[in-house]
Amino acid sequence: MTWFDYSLEPKSDIAFIDMKSFYASVECVDRGLHPLKTSLCVMSRADNSTGLILASSPMFKKVFGKSNVGRSYDLPFDVKTRKFSYYNARKQGLPTTIDYVNYIEEWAKSTVIVPPRMDTYIAVNMDIQKIFQDFAAPDDIYPYSIDEGFIDLTSSLNYFVPDKSISRKDKLDIISAAIQKKIWRKTGIYSTVGMSNANPY
């Protein structure tokens, strides 16, 4: 049997960066609202009972228990009146106690519902791509979608963190944090970063 020493494999330092609730965050920032504390959803045809929820803020998801994609009729409140929907609640097995009804209606009143603006999201994405280029060459940046992508920071580690006493893992962590901070300062968007020594292809 032939044994292979994987420690001899080339090392690569990859950061996978994901913008947190990107569309909803862009809409919040554009309105001077906190993207993590505001209940907001991006909905097409909000005037229609079958309006499509394209994106939502973390607070919206927490309060109403919904993911990014869904229909307005899946919500526990009526989009037009912002009143509790007993029909939807029963259909989904949700409680109908007075406390829960009041809770939903209070949040429904303050929830911001906006139409999608793809041109705006693309423009913010371009700003973020420029930030990536402050940390890596264009050939080392691999967009995955409008709100996430890989950056190969292998060639950048020692340039940004030349201290030889710091491990590659810690250097990757330092640079990733710097990227997150710059994205937030430039766009107001929060992001998450996953790091590894793997090939992004």
Where are these regions (language model features)?
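Gly/Gly-Pro- and Ser/Thr-rich, intrinsically disordered tail segments characteristic of DNA damage-repair
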Residues: 1-201
